[in-house]
């Protein structure tokens, strides 16, 4: 998505479709099998002026693989959720959100909708509350109870849901977790 914004912003492209999808094969009768959600989503980034306009962005690179699948494996594997939460999510997400808010000259209270992705439904709520967001008024639902863990499609699904509720001209925070954060 950031590359699409760059290409459209530079004038080299007028419209770019960005798509993501995931189907996670998990061990039978495992928590991963019960919580996995197959999904796909797409957004169009264009120069027509009717869509998103990025005001600020940040990236934090952190090679921590909470979930993975080897080429030779049939199913995804992952570290225990608490390990991923402490060593991955809690280290990078507050940093990237803080950088974006600072660059935009905004505070949590200024954000209309906050899309905060995460590897489980509780982490985004705890993070948002800790950073001063109104969890019931600003934070976008993670859709875990409806769609499950949609993996790579989660950021675009949540962005689409937030855009449906956002007021024109309002600020939207979009924070994505995976091998760091953006």
For the regions a protein language model found, what residue spans apply to each?
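Condensing-enzyme catalytic core mediating Claisen C-C bond formation in acyl metabolism
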Residues: 24, 28-94, 98, 177-182
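Structural alpha/beta core scaffold segments of enzyme domains
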Residues: 6-19, 23-25, 43-49, 98, ...
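Membrane-targeting and insertion segments and their boundary/processing signals
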Residues: 14-15, 63, 67-74, 129-130, ...
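Claisen-condensing/thiolase-fold acyl-transfer catalytic domains that form or cleave C-C bonds
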Residues: 1-12, 32-35, 112-182
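Phosphate/pyrophosphate-binding loops at sites that engage ATP/ADP/AMP, CoA/4′-phosphopantetheine
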Residues: 94-112, 131
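General beta-strand structural signal in soluble alpha/beta enzymes
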Residues: 18, 53-56, 116, 139-140
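General structural feature for long, well-ordered alpha-helical segments within catalytic domains
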Residues: 15, 40, 85, 89-96, ...
């Amino acid at each position: 998505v950031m590359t699409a914004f760059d290409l459209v912003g530079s004038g080299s492209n007028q419209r770019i479709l960005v798509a993501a999808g995931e189907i996670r094969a998990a061990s039978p009768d495992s928590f991963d099998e019960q919580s996995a959600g197959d999904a796909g989503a797409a957004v169009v980034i264009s120069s027509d002026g009717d869509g998103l306009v990025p005001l600020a962005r940040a990236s934090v690179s952190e090679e921590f693989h909470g979930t993975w699948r080897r080429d030779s494996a049939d199913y995804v594997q992952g570290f225990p959720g608490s390990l991923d939460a402490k060593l991955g999510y809690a280290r990078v997400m507050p940093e990237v959100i803080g950088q974006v808010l600072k660059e935009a000259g905004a505070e949590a209270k200024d954000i209309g909708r906050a899309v905060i992705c995460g590897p489980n439904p509780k982490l985004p709520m705890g993070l948002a509350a800790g950073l001063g967001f109104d969890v019931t008024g600003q934070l976008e639902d993670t859709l875990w109870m409806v769609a499950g863990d949609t993996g790579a499609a989660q950021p675009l699904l949540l962005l689409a849901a937030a855009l449906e509720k956002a007021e024109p001209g309002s600020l939207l925070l979009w924070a994505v977790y995976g091998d760091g954060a953006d």
